[in-house]
Amino acid sequence: MTNHVHLIIDPLDQPENLSVLMKKLSGKQTRYTNSLEGRSDTLWESRFKSSPVESDAYLLQCSRYVELNPVKANMVKQAENWKWSSYAVKVGISSKEWLDFDVCYIGLSKSESGRQSTYRQFVEGQASDKKDEQIHDALERCQLTGTGKFTDEIEKRMGRRIENRGPGRPRKGR
């Protein structure tokens, strides 16, 4: 993507680490680009957007959403041709030592070739426009990506109500 980046990151048990990581990443990338181009501007126009993802039900869906993003934007014909994607690694076309595989990907098969084949079939299979829209909307609004049960669990853990609402202020009651 020319104007944004998608990262699927597991902050483990410390979600605040995500903000620290993004601050450092933004600062380093901005300084690098500014020194390269002889400028003194900001690089990113706004704060990063994040959406906690329910691993079992939605992590693979989110991976497919990210892998197919450059294809849907007509930047490449096939996901494996996007040089910034993990797709080519996950289907065995190339290798990257720094890439960590998530538990859902690893759980696709006991063998590496089985995982690669299953993941390729999953990504190239019929994606649900409704799920893609749900993922996109959750990301745009920085809301949870998952089932109602997942939302309930997070509400209980946080001790506050979490509701996925549309954009804007609620209408006043008459």
Labelled PLM ranges:
Residues 4:
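Glycine/serine-rich anion-binding loops at beta->alpha junctions
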